[in-house]
């Protein structure tokens, strides 16, 4: 029985890993309506292509896979040119193989002859392939039907097999008829010329549907069938007329459907889809009844979805948090794991996940950490979840990251206090956590015995060569607090005042700069290295912004960066005669809120107030982070709850996912992030729960070593 179980589990993991990386999909759907951000169009002369601020239009009524496609609307003039590049949305692209096919679907809706179709090229950064005529690869050509175009990569000249494909370029071909053409493009991907072709005869299995106010969580049970490529989700409001709403890759077992209305019954069914897009028999139909939620139920719903990011995105071998749901390599994040532990403790307390499940996961984590590579007990930020070895590009980068280690230890200390039963499993977990905690030699991250600043990294090959001092009103606070609290390798308590509260900013090599006033600068050297110059930056600012007096922090920095120190450490317990941290967090939240009010007219026609801006620099001034606004709930509950309801009820169709709110968005550029960040996903349930019950704050502050720290700091 056990052998069968492990064989099936290994098989499932192998096909999930394959699906995560393979096939490579260049375009499936646009996350935003109207235009596709990851495209770039241009024309000249008497040619033309329809675009919106340089981006291809998105069509939501014509698609091959739900819910949209890209529209190519063009005129090929006799003295002009047009082209449109569609880019990968990430930095990886697709590394071509000799047996790969470039496959995409086209739908020709106008009177367009086969010879009037565009040409294509593939881009690999600056390298551009030879031009290929699409007409040469069309079979059974017809209008108003989806056609599959399959082009062997070996037939495309000037491709570099060692460089990833970054874009496909549709462009004006040899035909210059001067007529207007309209066609739609969907599902651009690279597949091997041979794919699993087992017929999907068994009907799909829909496990459950769970209704919330405006979203429905749909969960399925995937069979061990290698020819399944996607799960296709259908929705109906009358249990008769079903429409497809989404497809999901097999690396997911859940889809969250953000529905148009609440207080409505929705009916769902699913089908498996193979590599040729043939569908299996439908699953049974399940019903979800949405209803308007009160505040408490809405907060529960938000917390549950964000916590699911950590419960689902767990690396199998180590139990640690894996860095991407769509990458099969076993890279895990040390900091993300620490934040994930906090979120999952909330999940257990709220009965979203079983206590035993998290206990077993934590036991796996501490076993893995006990064998993983460390430097003076501290961990690198990225580890291989299979081997426990660092993931870096060169010997200098194979180093311990003290801030990532601090966030991991913070999570483990909370777990040590949560799993407090006198049972063998829980006592063994506490002992293992204590061993890891005591093993971190924080002193090794201070350059010399007379120094006060923690340095963010240390490498056995390069010592502090690529390391920088940390400090200031930001996420580094928890590293200083834990370093002072350590029962085995504590740094001086004075590091709080003379390290954390005296942040240093790198200026450059000290040579040639010695005339700079020593009152404003500090020369920091390391044995065998040239001295470097740092400026002392102010910690206390005592300034007024938008009528709010702010003692510390910066309105130039990300709000979420300044929220991180207080995920587990209750700011009310950090005694400092010069600053009340809880009040300062409240004031900082109000400053960001009022700054957004000052510019709210930009978006008043489409939504309520959007805040906070990600940053004040030109690159991020129009980007917003939903998590940062919601995470102010312990300090400014009224405006935080307003923000949560706005992002969910008014903008949920754009921002809500299986894992809660998206990372960032920019309406000016019609962009939303398709990636997730553990800080952004974790800070929402953690700070909501801290405001509601104080759970994480209470668990962390009751730790004996943290209690001793608080006494020291008084």
Regions found by a protein language model. Name each.
Residues 17-200:
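Beta-rich carbohydrate-recognition modules and glycan-binding surfaces
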Residues 1-23:
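Bacterial Sec-dependent N-terminal signal peptides
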Residues 175-178, 274-279:
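Short acidic/polar inter-strand loop motif in beta-rich domains
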Residues 214-227:
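Conserved aromatic anchor
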């Amino acid at each position: 029985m056990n052998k069968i179980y492990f064989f099936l589990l290994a098989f499932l993991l192998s096909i999930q890993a394959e699906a995560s990386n393979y096939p490579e999909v260049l375009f499936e759907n646009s996350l935003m309506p109207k235009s596709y951000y990851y495209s770039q169009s241009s024309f000249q002369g008497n040619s033309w292509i329809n675009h919106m601020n340089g981006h291809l239009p998105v069509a939501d009524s014509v698609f091959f896979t739900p819910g949209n496609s890209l529209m190519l609307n063009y005129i090929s003039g006799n003295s002009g040119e047009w082209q449109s590049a569609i880019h990968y949305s990430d930095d990886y692209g697709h590394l071509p193989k000799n047996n790969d096919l470039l496959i995409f679907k086209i739908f020709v809706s106008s009177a367009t002859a086969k010879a009037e179709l565009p040409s294509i090229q593939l881009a690999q950064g600056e390298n551009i392939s030879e031009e290929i005529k699409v007409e040469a690869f069309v079979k059974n050509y017809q209008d108003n039907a989806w056609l599959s175009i399959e082009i062997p990569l070996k037939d495309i000249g000037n491709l570099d097999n060692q460089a990833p494909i970054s874009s496909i370029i549709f462009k004006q071909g040899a035909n210059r008829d001067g007529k207007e053409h309209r066609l739609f493009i969907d599902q651009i991907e690279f597949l091997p010329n041979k794919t699993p072709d087992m017929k999907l005869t068994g009907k799909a299995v829909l496990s459950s549907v769970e209704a919330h106010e405006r979203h429905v969580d749909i969960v399925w049970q995937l069979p061990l069938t290698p020819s399944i490529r996607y799960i296709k989700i259908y929705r109906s409001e009358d249990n008769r007329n079903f429409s497809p709403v989404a497809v999901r890759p097999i690396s997911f077992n859940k889809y969250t459907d953000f529905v148009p209305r609440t207080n409505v019954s929705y009916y769902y069914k699913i089908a498996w889809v193979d590599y040729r897009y043939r569908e299996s028999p439908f699953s049974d139909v399940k019903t979800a009844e949405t209803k308007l939620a009160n505040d408490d139920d809405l907060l529960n719903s938000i917390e549950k979805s964000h916590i699911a990011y950590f419960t689902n995105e767990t690396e199998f071998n180590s139990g640690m948090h894996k860095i991407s749901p769509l990458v099969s390599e076993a890279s895990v994040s040390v900091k993300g794991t620490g934040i994930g532990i906090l979120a999952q403790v909330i999940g257990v307390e709220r009965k979203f996940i079983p206590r035993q499940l998290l206990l077993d996961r934590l036991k796996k984590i501490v076993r893995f950490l006990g064998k993983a590579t460390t430097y003076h007990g501290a961990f690198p930020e990225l580890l291989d979840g299979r081997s426990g070895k660092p993931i870096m590009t060169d010997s200098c980068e194979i180093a311990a990251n003290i801030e990532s280690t601090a966030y991991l230890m913070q999570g483990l200390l909370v777990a040590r206090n949560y799993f407090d039963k006198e049972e063998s499993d829980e006592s063994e977990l506490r002992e293992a956590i204590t061993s890891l905690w005591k093993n971190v030699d924080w002193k090794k991250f201070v350059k010399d015995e007379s120094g006060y600043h923690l340095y963010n990294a240390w490498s056995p090959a390069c010592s502090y060569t690529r390391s920088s001092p940390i400090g200031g009103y930001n996420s580094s606070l928890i590293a200083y607090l834990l370093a002072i609290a350590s029962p085995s390798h504590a740094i001086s308590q004075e590091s709080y005042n003379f390290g954390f509260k005296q942040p240093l900013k790198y200026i450059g090599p000290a040579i040639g700069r010695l005339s700079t006033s020593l009152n404003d600068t500090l020369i920091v050297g390391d044995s065998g290295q040239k001295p470097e110059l740092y400026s002392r930056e102010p910690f206390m600012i005592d300034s007024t912004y938008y009528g709010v007096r702010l003692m510390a922090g910066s309105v130039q920095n990300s709000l979420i960066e300044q929220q991180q120190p207080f995920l587990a450490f209750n700011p009310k317990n950090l005694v400092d005669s010069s600053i009340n941290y809880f009040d300062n967090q409240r004031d900082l939240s109000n400053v960001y809120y009022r700054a957004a009010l000052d510019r709210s007219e930009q978006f008043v026609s489409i939504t309520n107030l959007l805040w906070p801006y990600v940053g004040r620099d030109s690159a991020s001034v129009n980007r917003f982070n939903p998590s940062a606004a919601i995470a102010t709930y312990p300090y400014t509950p009224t405006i935080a709850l307003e923000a949560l309801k706005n992002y969910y009820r008014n903008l949920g169709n754009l921002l809500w996912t299986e894992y809660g709110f998206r990372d960032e968005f920019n309406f000016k550029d019609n962009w939303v992030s398709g990636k997730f960040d553990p800080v952004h996903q974790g800070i929402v349930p953690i700070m909501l729960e801290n405001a509601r019950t104080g759970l994480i704050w209470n668990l962390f502050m009751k730790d004996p070593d943290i209690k001793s720290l608080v006494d020291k700091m008084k």
